[in-house]
Amino acid sequence: MTTARTIAATLLLILAAAALGAQSPQGTGKELTVEEQWLQRSIALQIMREQAYASDADTKTAVLNDIAGRIAKGTLGGDRDAVEYILEYLAMEGSSRVVREGLRQVNNFPMVRRQATELLGKVRTEQSKNALIAVLLNDDEYMVKAQAAYALGELGMNENNEVAAALAFAVSREDLTRSDNNWAYAMVLAFEKLNRNAPGGLKYPEAYKSLIKISQGSFLATVRQKAVQVLDQMKQ
């Protein structure tokens, strides 16, 4: 499982790097490497990337706070793809990408992953959607998976029911007699938002099945009742 997750994370990071806009400079025919692309970015972005690569949670949190401020101010501009790359890296820190010293994992920072996941939903790119799906399906921490589900709902991208399918798959493989209430509620909210955003409502039977399962699971009454409420909304 760890090897599969590592491979998946590596592929996603490669795709993210490609999304940074590797193109041949006019008239030279030479393709820029990833590092050359980053050297063309602002000094601030280069520093932020190095902070993301740091080995301690405090430094990673500092760059996340910086990015959160930029998003709040609406100043990402043409740097959106580079910021997404940094957030994707941090959202998979310790889950899809594991670093060990001996037998001990040294990069398990669930709070960092949760915050990075939250911010990915605010970047609003196709790549951020793909990264959120990967986090939803690969992370072991319920609070991180819950944040990924909520962010996917907020993002609202669901072409060909791709996101709905990922959410339904996540529900199908959970033991709903022992799952987390916050996770389940976030899943319900995500389905609700997809239903509201879809013209004519969400038309995906697996989503209905997922909500029925949650409504019958061992969750708080608030969670089960919310699942029933969303099912009623879908009937209308």
Spans of model-derived segments:
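Bacterial N-terminal signal peptides that target proteins for export
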Residues: M1-A9
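Bacterial N-terminal signal peptides
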Residues: A9-A18
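Boundary at the C-terminal end of the N-terminal hydrophobic targeting segment
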Residues: A19-S24, G29
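Short, solvent-exposed mixed-charge patches
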Residues: Q23, K235-Q236
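Structural detector for internal amphipathic alpha-helices that build alpha-solenoid repeat scaffolds
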Residues: T28-W38, Y53, A57-G77, L103-V106, ...
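Amphipathic alpha-helical scaffolding segments comprising HEAT/armadillo-like alpha-solenoid repeats
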Residues: E31-Q51, K73-G102, T125-L137, N158-E174, ...
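Extended hydrophobic secondary-structure segments
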Residues: L136, V144-K145
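Short coil/turn segments at helix-helix junctions and helix-capping linkers
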Residues: D139-D140, G217-A221
